[in-house]
């Protein structure tokens, strides 16, 4: 049975995610930006938090761990490579490790670039991937610690997941990301459609998260770096995928 997913808006533009396994009663939180909305959502659902999964060390993803842990006693899971700058970990993770939430398990994927110790969690049985600030809706995270080559390798790993996978990322930056994507590919019908759907979601008060990987492959300029039309759009028709990705990232930084 697939896990139940609840997206929890936090802070100004962060997302946390709750995953619930009805059979076992276990519930996981992915990232901890803010305690109050998470604890309120747990109470409203009647779920008991058992696990906290952390994608990376930035404060807006971990700062509520102490309060949430104190309230719930949940086990904390995070990257072994970043243990020195994460809250105390009960389970230090490396690539390929698994985290069980009831009968379902997440596979840990190393995705350096935004930070060196960034990880993602892929739940293949539920077709879910929690990508933090690596792969984002129509975008990717800034390269605060990693290189373009590292981030491109990370995005390539995520792009190889099944296309029906729901990508759950850490922020709502979608309006700006789509404007940038459309500046590069103004005639992309998938982008035009996605912008229209986003406008509808905003009008109806629906959260624009998650999106399928198939939608990202059709609209996310960073994942589209290998395509001839994207290489032409940035004036690098013969360049490597990594070089094209780096150019797109540099342009987005200034957009």
UniProtKB/Swiss-Prot annotation:
Positions with a binding annotation for Zn(2+) 2: 60-61, 133, 171
The keyword Nucleus belongs to this UniProt entry's keyword annotation: no
CDD domains according to UniProt: hydroxyacylglutathione_hydrolase_MBL-fold
One annotated GO biological process: methylglyoxal catabolic process to D-lactate via S-lactoyl-glutathione
Residues engaged in binding Zn(2+) 1: 56, 58, 114, 133
EC identifiers of the protein: 3.1.2.6
Source organism superkingdom: Bacteria
GO MF terms, alphabetically ordered: hydroxyacylglutathione hydrolase activity; metal ion binding
Catalytic activities: an S-(2-hydroxyacyl)glutathione + H2O = a 2-hydroxy carboxylate + glutathione + H(+)
SUPFAM superfamilies in UniProt: Metallo-hydrolase/oxidoreductase (SSF56281)
SMART domains: Lactamase_B (SM00849)
Database matches in InterPro entries: Clx_II_MBL (IPR035680), Glyoxalase_II_hydrolase (IPR050110), HAGH_C (IPR032282), Hydroxyacylglutathione_Hdrlase (IPR017782), Metallo-B-lactamas (IPR001279), RibonucZ/Hydroxyglut_hydro (IPR036866)
PANTHER family: HYDROXYACYLGLUTATHIONE HYDROLASE, HYDROXYACYLGLUTATHIONE HYDROLASE GLOB
Subunit structure as annotated in this protein's UniProt entry: Monomer.
Function: Thiolesterase that catalyzes the hydrolysis of S-D-lactoyl-glutathione to form glutathione and D-lactic acid.
Protein name, as recorded: Hydroxyacylglutathione hydrolase
Taxonomic lineage: Bacteria, Pseudomonadati, Pseudomonadota, Alphaproteobacteria, Rhodobacterales
Originating gene: gloB
């Amino acid at each position: 049975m697939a896990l139940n997913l609840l997206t929890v808006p936090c802070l100004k533009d962060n997302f946390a995610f709750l995953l619930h396994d009805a059979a076992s009663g276990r519930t996981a939180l992915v990232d901890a930006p803010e305690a109050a909305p998470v604890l309120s959502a747990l109470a409203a659902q009647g779920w008991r938090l058992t696990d906290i999964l952390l994608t990376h060390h930035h404060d807006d993803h971990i700062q509520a761990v102490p309060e949430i842990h104190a309230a719930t006693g949940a086990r904390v899971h995070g990257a072994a490579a970043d243990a020195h700058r994460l809250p105390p970990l009960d389970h230090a993770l490396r690539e390929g490790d698994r985290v069980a939430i009831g009968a379902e398990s997440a596979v840990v994927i190393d995705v350096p670039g935004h930070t060196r110790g960034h990880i993602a969690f892929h739940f293949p049985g539920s077709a879910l991937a929690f990508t933090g600030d690596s792969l984002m809706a129509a975008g990717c995270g800034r390269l605060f610690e990693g290189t373009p080559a590292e981030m491109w390798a990370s995005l390539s790993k995520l792009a190889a997941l099944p296309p029906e996978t729901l990508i759950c990322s850490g922020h709502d930056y979608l309006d700006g990301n789509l404007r940038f994507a459309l500046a590069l590919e103004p005639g992309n019908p998938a982008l035009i459609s996605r912008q229209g759907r986003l406008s509808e979601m905003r009008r109806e008060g629906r959260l624009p998260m998650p999106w399928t990987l198939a939608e990202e492959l059709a609209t996310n300029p960073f994942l589209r770096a290998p395509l001839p039309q994207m290489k032409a759009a940035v004036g690098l028709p013969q360049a490597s995928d990594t070089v094209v990705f780096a150019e797109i990232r540099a342009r987005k930084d200034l957009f």
